[in-house]
């Protein structure tokens, strides 16, 4: 079953998004893992592409857009939106899902649902706690850099006009869940009804708080297991 989760970030360091996706980080603290010389270690495997960035990096494309439209100058402004599509671990064995295929699906999903936004699309081969599920990260700059053709899921001019910001509303999340289900159906991948799913819209701070809480629970369970309880 594929799922989609959303995180928003107010971090003005746009380069941090690509750094997180390409370098190894502690899955609980979010801190980079360093080698013996104190340098960040690259991830063992990933695929990464950018969209709507021209010849610039993702970070530079976002900064240029902010300057052009006079947006995202405040500390409380949402700078990026991060969507994570996680596929069923069984898809790799049962349905031939590869990183390359997942990356292609993620790129098309981004083009279809976040047109006009600078974006990073990055596929990783494994999830938290070695879950074995291929997953795709889609990080978009919150500001749209060009006017796009209106799509059925866009209900206000700010959803397609240049210089406007992405809105992750309940209606948008519902649309994205349906889009994920349709994507998996067309690709012959395992899927469940995501319209019954809950809890897929959290802030970056809430996300890491949940991860830290899970770590404490894992330690407690390990201690009980060691004591034979």
List where the protein language model places each region.
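N-terminal nicking endonuclease/strand-transfer module with a His-rich metal-binding environment
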Residues: 1-229
């Amino acid at each position: 079953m594929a799922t989609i989760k959303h995180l928003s970030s107010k971090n003005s360091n746009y380069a941090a998004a690509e750094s997180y996706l390409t370098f190894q980080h502690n899955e609980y603290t979010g801190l980079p893992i360093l080698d013996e010389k104190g340098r960040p270690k690259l991830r063992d495997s990933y695929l990464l592409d950018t969209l709507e960035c021209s010849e610039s990096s993702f970070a530079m494309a976002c900064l240029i857009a902010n300057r052009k439209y006079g947006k995202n100058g405040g500390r409380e402004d949402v700078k990026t939106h991060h969507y994570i599509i996680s596929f069923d671990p069984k898809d790799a064995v049962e349905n031939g899902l590869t990183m390359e295929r997942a990356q292609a699906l993620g790129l098309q999903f981004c083009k279809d649902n976040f047109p006009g936004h600078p974006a990073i699309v990055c596929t990783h081969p494994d999830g938290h706690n070695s879950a074995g599920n291929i997953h795709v990260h889609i990080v978009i700059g919150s500001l749209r850099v060009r006017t796009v053709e209106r799509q059925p899921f866009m209900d206000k001019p700010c959803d397609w006009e240049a210089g406007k910001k992405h809105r992750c509303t309940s209606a948008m999340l519902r649309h994205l869940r349906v889009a994920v289900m349709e994507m998996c159906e067309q690709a012959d991948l395992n899927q469940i009804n995501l319209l019954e799913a809950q809890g897929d819209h959290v802030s970056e701070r809430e996300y890491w708080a949940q991860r830290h809480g899970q770590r404490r629970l894992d330690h407690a369970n390990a201690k009980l297991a060691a004591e034979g309880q």
